[in-house]
Amino acid sequence: MTAFGVEPYGQPKYLEIAGKRMAYIDEGKGDAIVFQHGNPTSSYLWRNIMPHLEGLGRLVACDLIGMGASDKLSPSGPDRYSYGEQRDFLFALWDALDLGDHVVLVLHDWGSALGFDWANQHRDRVQGIAFMEAIVTPMTWADWPPAVRGVFQGFRSPQGEPMALEHNIFVERVLPGAILRQLSDEEMNHYRRPFVNGGEDRRPTLSWPRNLPIDGEPAEVVALVNEYRSWLEETDMPKLFINAEPGAIITGRIRDYVRSWPNQTEITVPGVHFVQEDSPEEIGAAIAQFVRQLRSAAGV
């Protein structure tokens, strides 16, 4: 039976990016293995997966701006924490961390869009990509299960502000609702901590669903996702697709589509969306094997 550790992995470090303090984990030595979370999580999501990679490289996990232990933006409001703003902060942090030229990316949720985008811009620096419950193509509302569709349509309406900023729906309902097991109070409190204050401190959890590429909007994110998926569906870059069963955003036609990507290994593990909280040992072991094969092929 899987043991679900509650303690964070490693010791947080901090760098100032554009006047804001950003938090990250940076443990071990060697070529970088970069774990990137999405909404509404943090590097805490990877706590039970990163130990499986010890000894295989430098393990890096960053907290997006306004999330985890990273600073909030001020002033805040509806125009803050867009995909573009999040990307600018994260890519600047990755640049400052000097990740090297043999990077393995481990991606989830919005971390996948950011990582796929970065990989597309730095193709010669990426050795391989592991991804799970990722943003692999623009979506339509028909791709969403009815039970979830209404909530996300709500986020993209004027009701989004009270839902997210007042009632903290993304943390209190969406997060635990997309995990098969029940998180402990201690685990939930780690995820609550960045958003304990109501109002604008919770803005990132609302801006992210408003940036999802659904039915052609927002156009700039749809264009971005189409740009990186056009590359991913033809590149021989080694890929590990960690398929969640039953899954949430890679299901149906989208699952069929992603299975067409070349030079890709697939495993299936139990999970909905936050699959790291249900199957960390299976995920960690699969990524470790993937990295060993990459390093061996490269003669490292």
From Swiss-Prot:
The EC designation for this entry is 3.8.1.5
User: Which UniProt key words apply to this protein?
Assistant: Hydrolase
Segments forming domain AB hydrolase-1: 32-155
Broad enzyme group: hydrolase
Subunit field text = Monomer.
Q: Which NCBIfam families match?
A: PRK03592.1
What family does this chain come from, according to its entry? Belongs to the haloalkane dehalogenase family. Type 2 subfamily.
The entry's protein name is: Haloalkane dehalogenase
What organism is this sequence from? Mycobacterium bovis (strain BCG / Pasteur 1173P2)
- Lineage summary: Bacteria, Bacillati, Actinomycetota, Actinomycetes, Mycobacteriales
